[in-house]
């Protein structure tokens, strides 16, 4: 998601490219699965007819409050927002009497309002409680997880989700501090501990970057949510419906790329070679990255990748 160029500023990444790819029928029913501060949603609404509809979803209650109260609230009758993870899309649609949609947009990752608010605990740039939950009403904070997990488990999380080669040393230091009666409870404490444990540093990158990323992904089950959300898209999209995903990390993009590719070709069951191939359900349409001007204006956009696919159902009998 990564909206913003500074504290509490919200510059939506790949805004026009994403919405242009998503909205192919102005009368359609669309879903913004990651509302954030509404950058994509507002542009989607501007492209819909009076008959069009937009369901927005966000697991962060602050995002829902932003859409429903205050000066920035959305009053358009074609718009509705739900507080939920986008992986729950099928149930949310069923509750509204909707079976199929014309498009789903997912803008993956943490947003600038989350990063820039020290109380949310996502960033090492300012001290705050080590929370990291995108939905503070659900689940376990990063501090609570680190207060109970063993060294091997912590190291695996930091290595697998942060691709941090000093994961074992960091985990060892975390557990040693906990056993000494000083568990890490703030972002500042975690950043200082990691800086001491990491022996070599990447130019231009804070040594705590990978550890913070790993814990955030783990605490919010982000990769599982993404996998479930993509499966939900396949279930809910109409033939011709669009799946538009913006990701900011190779772990996320790899999941999206693999999912689209795996459903973009007919598959022959080698155990039954004379049976008809399994249907091709998606067609890849585009892969885009921000241009130089956008990256210059918003450095957080530099790692973004936009992928677009269309549901086809080729090979399925009518």
Curated annotation (Swiss-Prot):
Its EC number is 2.1.1.199. S-adenosyl-L-methionine binds at residues 38-40, 58, 86, 107, 114. GO terms for molecular function: rRNA (cytosine-N4-)-methyltransferase activity. It is found in: Cytoplasm. One of its GO terms (biological process) is rRNA base methylation. Its main location: cytoplasm. This is Ribosomal RNA small subunit methyltransferase H. The lineage of its organism: Bacteria, Pseudomonadati, Pseudomonadota, Betaproteobacteria, Burkholderiales. The gene is rsmH.
